[in-house]
Amino acid sequence: PPYFAPYVQGFKTIKPNDWEAIKTSFDDTTAALMIECVQGEGGVNLIDPKWAQAAAQAARKAGAIVMADEVQTGFGRTGSLLASDELGFEPEVVSFAKGVAGGLPMGGILFRGKANGVFKAGDHQSTFAGNPLACAAGLVVLNELQKPEFLEGVKEKGEYIRSQIKNWKNKNVGEVRGKGLMIGADIVEGLSAVEVEKKLLENGLLTSTAGKNTLRLVPPLNISQSEIDEGLEILRKTLETF
């Protein structure tokens, strides 16, 4: 998104699921490929697993490592521990944050393969890294995510929310997509997703926007069925006012 500018130097961006770009984007000057497993700020755009695997293969053939940006998608958000597991491209580096400590500030990087050993014990990475409170919360989150029924519940809740919104056939909503509890609903041209977001907040439902005109729904992973239905009712009634 433009509001992230200026972008980090040294990166060349390619559109997700662009097969032609794979053929021309990698050479012996390429250090790494980073894949955002579901484009969050870009509009909750899904990545084709076959494309991700092909892009990773092309990058490795050029001598590069493959990295996964799991800051938004990691630790259960999409219904898997890591969304890259679902895409099947097996990254050497994974960055994560947000949900790992259940809302407390925490983040980290995982390394393996060619990237293993880049950081060693004692290397400075973060002033407040490893603080006891966030780590204790992280352990609780990880224990919950180890339960298969929890992650399966995330998938079921997400499918329920998406199907309900689609079934309304509201004139103000275009495509509805997502994975797990990372959901995007495109707002049709002529109506601003930001205006919908503001009205929803007035009515008691916290959402956000992404991409060009997408309403983004990312509820807590432990949201109850009654809370889902309450939120959906607010969303339905609000959309009908436009």
Residue ranges and their predicted role:
Residues 1-242:
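Conserved N-terminal phosphate-binding loop of PLP-dependent enzymes in the Aspartate aminotransferase
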